[in-house]
Amino acid sequence: MSRSFSRFGLSIPSIGLGTWELRGRKCRRVVRKALEVGYRHIDTAAMYENESEVGSGIVDSGVDRKEVFLTTKIDTTTVKNEGIIDAFNQSLSNLKTDYVDLLLIHWPTFSTNLGDMLEIMYGIKESQKVRAIGVSNFNTTLLNECTRLGFEDIYCNQVEYHPFLSQEILLKKMNEMDVIPVAYC
């Protein structure tokens, strides 16, 4: 699991553990075991309601936090721009860490101003509590909007991708923009 993809001097491991639908002691145990067997990328989100268990699993593993690439996401369906900083700080507290490697916009909505949201998230990055900003479930239109708004340094786009959903047009756009594809299935 040593292969990784790098951008802006930050490497993301090629295989990660997604924690969607993991809860309670099972989540904590799975995260700990994954790290013990060599996983170094753990993906969670406030929407998954398991950040506390993920954080405990990381602590329980004994793996140095600097060796773990940790991703979480801002839930744009419930958090509006004025609540992003508080939501992020709650995620840090739940995860028992003072930074995350990657912060994503989770499930974009059109009721939120994308430019304002990215501006706030990049402000969090400036505080060094986040190493990279990315997006999740963005289509080509939304990626183009990021560029139009001046946010050309999006680290990655986490999207559903598998043999039954190839996303070739989206992957081509991401390649043109030098945005790392992160797949879930």
Give the positions of each predicted feature.
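N-terminal binding-site loop/beta-alpha segment at the start of enzyme catalytic domains
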Residues: 1-68
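Conserved, mostly hydrophobic/aromatic
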Residues: 17, 34, 42, 54, ...
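Active-site beta-loop-alpha junctions enriched in small/polar residues
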Residues: 20-22, 45-47, 73-77, 105-108, ...
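Beta/alpha (TIM)-barrel catalytic core signal, keyed to glycine-rich beta->alpha loops juxtaposed to Asp/Glu
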Residues: 108-185
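Short, acidic/polar
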Residues: 22-35, 80-96, 116, 141-144, ...
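Alpha-helical scaffolding within the catalytic cores
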Residues: 1-4, 52-59, 87-90, 140-143, ...
